Swiss-Prot record:
The lineage of its organism: Bacteria, Pseudomonadati, Chlamydiota, Chlamydiia, Chlamydiales. Belongs to the queuine tRNA-ribosyltransferase family. It comes from Chlamydia trachomatis serovar A (strain ATCC VR-571B / DSM 19440 / HAR-13). Homodimer. Within each dimer, one monomer is responsible for RNA recognition and catalysis, while the other monomer binds to the replacement base PreQ1. It holds the Pfam family TGT. GO terms for biological process: queuosine biosynthetic process; tRNA-guanine transglycosylation. The active site is at residues 89, 281. Pathway: tRNA modification; tRNA-queuosine biosynthesis. InterPro entries: TGT (IPR004803), TGT-like_sf (IPR036511), tRNA_ribo_trans-like (IPR002616). One of its GO terms (molecular function) is metal ion binding. The gene is tgt. Its cofactor is Zn(2+). This is Queuine tRNA-ribosyltransferase.
């Protein structure tokens, strides 16, 4: 079955809504946080059964072990032992981000290429690039990307698009946008030949230009995508993100689920959920955990700080995550980080992921009560 989306409550205070997405592998209560499992695994988190939707990266899975190899083993759900919904990207984000650097690096570098020029050539056919593992030459077209995602068997898939740096040349930005929408149409056409149980979201580009965002919305809305994903460069700070997401969401129909690509830190979630965003993906909680940043209701806690060296309180008093319920103290967790014990990142990641799910439940409750 393709996904079904139902709005259960529309807030009287904002455009925020509580909904439910149903897929062949289960349902997702929205708004939802979607953690990124780059290679099919959440770093530092052993149990993902309580995570409603997980984001896996097609590019990395193509490079190793290969989409066809995963298909031969029954698909991604079987391969990683997950009986719950999965979303995959097209592979384009990783290709272009490896060439230009992360979003933050794009901004700082004003679009100068990073990563040893992994992109060989981009044209209307697709993108020629080098594997980050062994340097072999690879090619990704809209059709190849979608077929790879069909081999993986994710519940929600994305069309191939081109990610540009924040300060891309305006002329090339226009050319890229036009090419991206051609790629998206080709991706959708290929998908619709044999949709199976999968659904495809259209990706809306346009940078920080409101008129381009509106054009992107019209493009996606006019095609039979199952949902909408707000993608591309969203600006250089939270204010830019809020402005871009606000304009974009206002030009999308309410009937389709809306996903915000690559944005899932708590300040951004709180700032944009009121626009009616239904899901947010990010590696934020696990990456923060590996660097000793602990998420709490009182704000982030830098566990490496000397003040926690003899603190025998749980990581967060009152928290029911596995780490806190097993009595992992702040002093002990700090010690593990200081001696570079791998368990440090594991306990911190378990806590941070639990915290994100807790915050999303609170957000849904706030919307249901018209407080958000």
């Amino acid at each position: 079955m393709a996904l079904r989306f139902e709005i259960l409550h529309q807030s009287k205070k904002s455009r925020a809504r509580v909904g439910r997405i149903e897929t062949a592998h289960g349902y997702i209560d929205t708004p939802a946080f979607v953690p990124v499992a780059t290679n099919g695994a959440l770093k530092g988190v052993l149990d993902h059964s309580n995570i409603p939707l997980m984001f896996c990266n097609t590019y990395h899975l193509i490079v190793h072990p290969g989409a066809e190899a995963i298909a031969a083993m029954g698909g991604l759900h079987q391969f990683i032992g997950r009986n719950a919904p999965i979303i995959t990207d097209s592979g384009g984000f990783q290709i272009f981000s490896l060439a230009y650097g992360s979003v933050a690096e794009e901004i700082k570098s004003c679009g100068k290429k990073k990563g040893g020029n992994t992109i060989i050539k981009v044209n209307d056919d697709g993108v020629h690039f080098k594997s980050y593992r062994d340097g072999r030459k690879l090619f990704l077209s809209p059709e190849i990307s979608v077929q790879a995602q069909k081999d993986l068997g994710a519940d929600i898939i994305l069309p191939l698009d081109e990610l540009l740096p924040f300060h891309a040349d305006p002329t090339y930005f226009h050319q890229s946008s036009q090419r991206t929408y051609v790629w998206e149409k080709r991706s959708l056409d290929y998908h619709l030949k044999n949709p199976g149980i999968q659904s495809m979201y259209g990706v809306i580009h346009g940078g920080t230009f409101p008129d381009q965002r509106k054009l992107g919305c019209k493009f996606v809305e006019d095609l039979p995508f199952d949902g909408s994903a707000i993608g591309g460069s969203l600006g250089k700070n939270l204010q830019d993100i809020v402005e871009v997401v606000g304009v974009t969401a206002a030009n999308l129909s309410a009937e389709r689920p809306r996903h915000l690509l690559g944005i899932g830190d708590l300040p951004s979630i709180w700032a944009t959920v009121g626009f009616g965003i239904d899901s947010f993906d990010s590696s934020y909680p696990t990456k923060a955990a590996r660097h000793g940043m602990i998420l709490t209701l009182q704000g982030p806690l830098k566990i490496n700080n000397q003040r926690y060296s003899s603190d025998l309180n749980p990581i967060e008093p009152g928290c029911s995550c596995l780490a806190c319920s097993q009595g992992i103290t702040r002093a002990y967790l700090r010690h593990l980080f200081k001696v570079h014990e791998p368990n440090a990142g594991i306990w911190a990641s378990i806590h941070n992921m639990h915290h994100m799910q807790k915050v999303m439940r609170e957000i849904r409750e706030g919307i249901l009560n018209d407080r958000i």
